[in-house]
Amino acid sequence: MPMFIVNTNVPRASVPEGFLSELTQQLAQATGKPAQYIAVHVVPDQLMTFSGTNDPCALCSLHSIGKIGGAQNRNYSKLLCGLLSDRLHISPDRVYINYYDMNAANVGWNGSTFA
């Protein structure tokens, strides 16, 4: 159930076609979880600053049942910062990503939970 959320001040018009699909496929590969369970939410046009400037930036979160931890998070950070840099032109030093290891009983889907 990985869910990746990107809040950014990058304009909607600058988000390339296929970016969400690319994030989905890359996260499926990185987490080892099926793409059918991965949700991606990109929220452009946000009023945001980072280091006191309005240059492109992003505040992100990755939620997952398992597959969250030290070495894994470093790999995700490298992957996701790379994609945000390549596709949205956001410098990696202007991105924060928070990681959340979710309890399966606390994640609802399809009328039930993952527990």
Curated annotation (Swiss-Prot):
Its EC number is 5.3.2.1, 5.3.3.12. The modification N6-acetyllysine is found at K78. It is found in: Secreted; Cytoplasm. GO terms for molecular function: chemoattractant activity; cytokine activity; cytokine receptor binding; dopachrome isomerase activity; identical protein binding; phenylpyruvate tautomerase activity; protease binding. It comes from the Eukaryota. GO terms for biological process: cell surface receptor signaling pathway; cellular senescence; DNA damage response, signal transduction by p53 class mediator; inflammatory response; innate immune response; negative regulation of apoptotic process; negative regulation of cellular senescence; negative regulation of DNA damage response, signal transduction by p53 class mediator. Substrate binds at K33, I65, N98. The modification N6-succinyllysine is found at K78. The active site is at P2 (proton acceptor). Keywords: Acetylation, Cytokine, Cytoplasm, Immunity, Inflammatory response, Innate immunity, Isomerase, Secreted. InterPro entries: Macrophage_inhib_fac, Macrophage_inhib_fac_CS, Tautomerase/MIF_sf. One of its GO terms (cellular component) is myelin sheath. Pro-inflammatory cytokine involved in the innate immune response to bacterial pathogens. The expression of MIF at sites of inflammation suggests a role as mediator in regulating the function of macrophages in host defense. Counteracts the anti-inflammatory activity of glucocorticoids. Has phenylpyruvate tautomerase and dopachrome tautomerase activity (in vitro), but the physiological substrate is not known. It is not clear whether the tautomerase activity has any physiological relevance, and whether it is important for cytokine activity. Homotrimer. Interacts with CD74 and CXCR2 extracellular domain and COPS5. Interacts with the USO1 and BNIPL. PANTHER family: D-DOPACHROME DECARBOXYLASE (PTHR11954), MACROPHAGE MIGRATION INHIBITORY FACTOR (PTHR11954:SF6). Belongs to the MIF family. This is Macrophage migration inhibitory factor. It comes from Mus musculus. The lineage of its organism: Eukaryota, Metazoa, Chordata, Craniata, Vertebrata. The gene is Mif.
